[in-house]
Amino acid sequence: MSDRSAVLPQYLFPKQALTNFAGWVAGKERGAVTTWIIRRFVAKYGVDMGEALESDINHYKSFNQFFTRALKPGVRPLAQADLVCPVDGAISQFGAIEGDQIFQAKGHNYSTTALVGGDAVLAARFAHGSFATLYLSPKDYHRIHMPCDGRLVRMIHVPGDLFSVNPVTARGVPGLFARNERVVCVFESAHGPFVLVLVGATIVGSMATVWHGVVNPPRGGELREWHYADQQILLKQGEEMGRFLLGSTVVMLFPPPPLAFNPDWAPTRPVRLGEAMANLANL
């Protein structure tokens, strides 16, 4: 079966209703039922609870509390690199932005303008720059951290579809990451602007940032944005900036010149928060 055929049912599936329901269930505190669900999830996906700040699953009152669990201090040391990996997950793709085109999968590109919600001026700052797309699987730690020091400038909530995100949909759904619902976070750093995009997916109940809290829901048809240039919201390298309440993917954009990525990086390779991602080629 081709990838396009494999994803065809998702065009027909009531993804929004399923996602809303999953988010509602994940937030409920159901005592022994919640504990049973968490225990089954840990066993099914091989979650390493030994790394969690609270390793006893009976501690978690809801599935969302478990899913967004904190890690023990020191289990993810920061590498000596200009940019460190912001998540636990796996590499989807990374490399140079060709003009304004980001590589998604063989035969599929999408534009930086589409990714950031249609702002061509913002997107132009990353022309011929670099990108990295990282996928978080169900077993992974689901908080997102800063790849480098940054000052928050702007946040954009872009409404969109809710296709599941995995290698099959990346190959079978054109413009997947610029098509799904997403939260675009724009930062300034000592080396220029950079963007972290939190991409939603089927059953991703919501996405949250440390400065705003839950961004979605509400889910509507209108793009929403917030400006922070007059506020001193400063986040250090490795500091938490957001989290997924179930699911998905982070896309990062950096301006030119192209980054010198970790030579060990390759598509599908597992990555850990804090490992070396890239160095700035002009330093």
Swiss-Prot record:
<feature type="active site" description="Charge relay system; for autoendoproteolytic cleavage activity">
    <location>
        <position position="145"/>
    </location>
</feature>
<dbReference type="GO" id="GO:0006646">
    <property type="term" value="P:phosphatidylethanolamine biosynthetic process"/>
</dbReference>
<dbReference type="Pfam" id="PF02666">
    <property type="entry name" value="PS_Dcarbxylase"/>
</dbReference>
<keyword id="KW-0670">Pyruvate</keyword>
<keyword id="KW-0594">Phospholipid biosynthesis</keyword>
<dbReference type="InterPro" id="IPR003817">
    <property type="entry name" value="PS_Dcarbxylase"/>
</dbReference>
<protein>
    <recommendedName>
        <fullName>Phosphatidylserine decarboxylase proenzyme</fullName>
        <ecNumber>4.1.1.65</ecNumber>
    </recommendedName>
</protein>
<dbReference type="InterPro" id="IPR033178">
    <property type="entry name" value="PSD_type1_pro"/>
</dbReference>
<feature type="active site" description="Charge relay system; for autoendoproteolytic cleavage activity">
    <location>
        <position position="88"/>
    </location>
</feature>
<keyword id="KW-0472">Membrane</keyword>
<keyword id="KW-0456">Lyase</keyword>
<keyword id="KW-0210">Decarboxylase</keyword>
<comment type="similarity">
    <text>Belongs to the phosphatidylserine decarboxylase family. PSD-B subfamily. Prokaryotic type I sub-subfamily.</text>
</comment>
<comment type="pathway">
    <text>Phospholipid metabolism; phosphatidylethanolamine biosynthesis; phosphatidylethanolamine from CDP-diacylglycerol: step 2/2.</text>
</comment>
<keyword id="KW-0443">Lipid metabolism</keyword>
<keyword id="KW-1003">Cell membrane</keyword>
<comment type="function">
    <text>Catalyzes the formation of phosphatidylethanolamine (PtdEtn) from phosphatidylserine (PtdSer).</text>
</comment>
<dbReference type="GO" id="GO:0004609">
    <property type="term" value="F:phosphatidylserine decarboxylase activity"/>
</dbReference>
<keyword id="KW-0865">Zymogen</keyword>
<comment type="subunit">
    <text>Heterodimer of a large membrane-associated beta subunit and a small pyruvoyl-containing alpha subunit.</text>
</comment>
<keyword id="KW-1208">Phospholipid metabolism</keyword>
<keyword id="KW-0444">Lipid biosynthesis</keyword>
<feature type="active site" description="Schiff-base intermediate with substrate; via pyruvic acid; for decarboxylase activity">
    <location>
        <position position="248"/>
    </location>
</feature>
<feature type="site" description="Cleavage (non-hydrolytic); by autocatalysis">
    <location>
        <begin position="247"/>
        <end position="248"/>
    </location>
</feature>
<feature type="modified residue" description="Pyruvic acid (Ser); by autocatalysis">
    <location>
        <position position="248"/>
    </location>
</feature>
<feature type="active site" description="Charge relay system; for autoendoproteolytic cleavage activity">
    <location>
        <position position="248"/>
    </location>
</feature>
<dbReference type="InterPro" id="IPR033177">
    <property type="entry name" value="PSD-B"/>
</dbReference>
<dbReference type="GO" id="GO:0005886">
    <property type="term" value="C:plasma membrane"/>
</dbReference>
